[in-house]
Amino acid sequence: RMYNGAYSARDHGVSLAFVTSNEIYWQVRFERDNEGRARRVIVGYKDFKPDPVRNRALRTILWRDLGRPEQELSGVQLPTNGFLDWGGLPFVPIHTHTWPFKGTGLRSGVAVPGELVGYEIDSFDPTYPAPNAVWRVLIGASPFVNFEGDSGYTHNMSIYRARSGALVWATGSMDWSWTLAPGGSSDGAHNNVRPSLQRLTENVLGRMLAGGRR
């Protein structure tokens, strides 16, 4: 119902901002607690033990395996093993001619240094459906090597306008908040605040608050 509610909000014109990553991965369910009270325990078997429930509407399974890939809503999704051991990576903007970059001074392909993309990192996967959008663009493409040393991964930031008029923005980075306010770094000692990325965030949220029409 939560996932359906997010879809419904978007389809009724409510803009959505995913200012993190890996927000929608597993279908989980609620069960009774040891005292018999309903909907008190969140259940997610993941890979540790087979889920005894076979009903796909209740089974704890990846949304994409249910035919409802996360990127159909947010625009990006976590690739298999798409995360780092620790820290973060520079952010590489693309399509900087588009309105989210107004006043940022950023240029396509020129990396913004710092621990800005991490540690769970989303991508757009062309083997799954894209959002049902009237306008869609990826505005970040940062290559990375995952925690196992595998290359070939790329972080993506996505923004699109749904047919309802809603804007949907996904940073694709668990650490995006580090770019916005002091105190965010892997060692607690470095400053990852970037005025250019604060401005990008302001541009997107400002247009959402203006009804997507500014």
Question: Which functions belong to the PLM regions below?
Answer:
Residues Q27-R32, G36-N81:
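E1/E1-like adenylate-forming module used to activate ubiquitin-like modifiers
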Residues Y25-K46, L84-G88, V92-R214:
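Extracellular ligand-binding/catalytic regions of CAZymes and related secreted enzymes
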Residues R1-W26, N191:
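Short alpha-beta junction capping motif
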